[in-house]
UniProtKB/Swiss-Prot annotation:
GO MF annotation list: ATP binding; DNA binding; DNA ligase (ATP) activity; metal ion binding
Protein name per the record: DNA ligase
Cofactor(s) required for function per UniProt: Mg(2+)
Enzyme Commission no: 6.5.1.1
Organism: Metallosphaera sedula (strain ATCC 51363 / DSM 5348 / JCM 9185 / NBRC 15509 / TH2)
Positions of the catalytic residues: K261 (n6-amp-lysine intermediate)
């Protein structure tokens, strides 16, 4: 399959903002994609070479490397490329412009002989990009530049444009996983009615390229038989939130299992034979940060093939008391991990079992999952079952909540124990409800919002980003709707971090998945997630979250709490959750029903 066809579709997709049109065109691309490369095409659409959970390296070519490669490919001086880049502001367009001026293919040391421009095929492109990503050690920088220069030299202008953007991490297609799932269902199932089957398979095996390969080569019926696979993460089950214990117990029909909600890092732990792998909430491979935890699991959790879930929590080695979540940040550094492991010890608190020795436990009710989890855990002081009770009264839930807070937990997770209490992978529902600490605010809880824009500061902050445009996620439309502008709560260190984060993700135009009336100084690709608290939720004509006749919903006096690197944009607080918080706030504060006209 020719890569030029992919590039031409990318060019068309980039110009579309309607999700319906995006889905239709993406489906058309899949129909024209050869079955043996469809997984690679899906990865390219996602802007990656492989799923994050593989732990494989990224491309590793920054702006300066790309400028050198473009100059080498087209016979220009680096200064000329830099000047053109300053004028155009897009290295992909720079490559397109320079390649358009080159006639034929000049001599360049590159494996591939005298291949003519436009003859690149998808597998050739993919394999060369893999070589670039996996090139390490002495001289790897020059190898990466030379390989990429050779690749774009053989490319047509449109291919060069999207190859550069891919390597730079700026594809700008505006396509989320939900849109890909819709397109796969339409292409290989015949209609969007098959979306639940495709989505369930993806929730249990979070490798979108592999799901595309299975449905394209073996048919949609094959997806119905997909079950969890150790080594491939399951999309985590998510909880709803409520501030009132009485209302929570009503939702649970008067009886529920109540776990501590630990202030740690949620972890999905897979064992396949002798290999133990740990995935974050975002399904990234974080095994290297928790080598000690892998050893604990091997020692104390019985079985050779299983998937369990829990919370990794920093603890005081002397007292065993829980320590602040921030201590885990020390384990994210690339150097001296062994020292960090020794200095910042952790315990693992398990709360679920999804797969054990060939059996899918996601379809079993929670009491059965928990009983098996307790059965396979040997007594020890490193790995524990999450502290829990069975609550059948509101006062019992309330007392346990205060006990959890007093012992350093964030709150509690209240979980259904009924016959339908399955593990809903990738879904947010009322089977789990979180009750967190009251922040002494009209907002009963923090929210996790996505950065979609940034504003420059004034005075001593002049020339630097000092506030962020934040959005909630609308899962029905697969878009991000603005809800507030955050300018307070940042420490000096966090402000410095903000500059780097925003500069890496800034873009000239609004991302197609962002719905905003407010125009920031800089648009940002919706990738970063931050935890935010505010005074209350109000109606605002400036924001688009849950917009109705009177405006959208907005958070008054928002304050930054912390970055949530463990969450993906799609894990952010949803527009519906914001609406529910607003409704409950009105009921509590104004003692009148929610205005249905918003």
């Amino acid at each position: 399959m020719k890569f030029k066809l992919i590039a031409e579709y990318f060019d068309r997709l980039e110009k579309i903002s309607s999700r319906i049109q995006l889905t239709s065109l993406l489906s058309d691309l899949f129909k024209n994609t050869e079955r043996e490369v469809i997984d690679k095409v899906v990865y390219l659409i996602q802007g990656r070479l492989w799923p994050d959970f593989t732990g494989m390296p990224e491309i590793g070519m920054g702006e300066k490397f790309l400028i050198k490669a473009i100059a080498m490919a087209y016979g220009n001086k680096e200064e000329e490329v830099e000047k053109l880049y300053k004028n155009i502001g897009d290295l992909g367009e720079v490559a397109y412009s320079l390649r358009s001026k080159v006639k034929g293919v000049s001599i360049l040391s590159f494996v591939g002989g005298n291949q003519e421009a436009g003859e690149l095929d998808v597998m050739e492109v993919y394999n060369e990009l893999v070589k670039i990503a996996t090139s390490t050690g002495e001289g790897s920088r020059d190898i990466k530049i030379r390989i990429f220069a050779g690749l774009i030299k053989k490319a047509t202008p449109i291919e060069a444009k999207y190859l550069v953007r891919f390597v730079e991490g700026r594809l700008r297609l505006g396509i989320g996983d939900a849109t890909v799932l819709d397109a796969l269902a339409i292409t290989f199932g015949g209609s969007a009615d098959y979306r639940p089957i495709v989505e369930r398979a993806y929730n249990l095996r979070a490798d979108l390229g592999d799901i595309a390969r299975v449905i394209a080569t073996e048919g949609i019926e094959k997806l119905k038989n997909i079950s969890p696979t150790p080594g491939i993460p399951i999309r985590p089950m998510l909880a709803e939130r409520l501030p009132d214990p009485e209302e929570i117990m009503e939702k649970m029909n008067g009886k529920a299992l109540v776990d501590y909600k630990y202030d740690g890092e949620r972890a999905q732990i897979h064992r396949k034979g002798d290999k133990v792998t740990i995935f974050s909430r975002r399904m990234e491979n974080i095994t290297d940060q928790y080598i000690d935890v892998t050893e604990y699991v091997k020692q104390f959790v019985k079985g050779d093939n299983f998937i369990v879930e829990g919370e990794i929590v920093p603890v005081d080695p002397e007292s065993g008391e829980m320590r602040p979540f921030q201590e885990l940040m020390h384990r994210r550094r690339k150097n001296n991990i062994a020292e960090a492991i020794k200095e910042y010890p952790v315990n693992l608190f398990l709360f679920d079992l999804m797969f054990f020795e060939g059996e899918d436990y996601t379809t079993k009710p929670l009491p059965e999952r928990r009983a098996k989890l307790e059965e396979i855990l040997a007594s020890n002081d490193k790995v524990h079952i999450a502290s829990h009770i069975i609550a059948d009264r509101v006062d019992k839930l309330r007392e346990y909540f205060y006990q959890a807070i007093s012992e350093g937990a964030e709150g509690v997770m209240v979980k259904s124990i009924g016959p339908d209490s399955i593990y809903q992978a990738g879904s947010r529902g009322w089977l789990w409800i979180k009750l967190k600490r009251d922040y002494q605010s009209e907002m009963a809880d923090t929210v996790d919002l996505v950065v979609v824009g940034a504003f420059y500061g004034k005075g001593k902050r002049g020339g630097k980003f000092s506030s962020l445009l934040m959005a909630a996620y609308n899962p029905e439309k697969d878009v991000f709707e603005t809800v507030c502008k955050v300018a307070s709560g940042f420490s000096d260190q966090e402000l410095d971090e903000m500059q780097k984060k925003i500069n890496e993700l800034k873009r000239e135009q609004k991302h197609p998945r962002v719905v905003s009336d407010m125009i920031p100084d800089v648009w940002v690709s919706p990738t970063l997630v931050a935890e935010v608290i505010g005074a209350e939720i109000t109606i605002s004509p400036l924001h688009t979250c849950c917009r109705g006749e009177k405006g959208g919903l907005s958070i008054r006096f928002p304050r930054f709490i912390r970055w949530r690197d463990d969450k993906s944009p799609e894990d952010a607080t949803t527009n519906q959750e914001i609406m529910e918080m607003y409704s409950k706030q009105l009921k509590k504060i104004e003692e009148k029903p929610v205005d249905e006209n918003i």
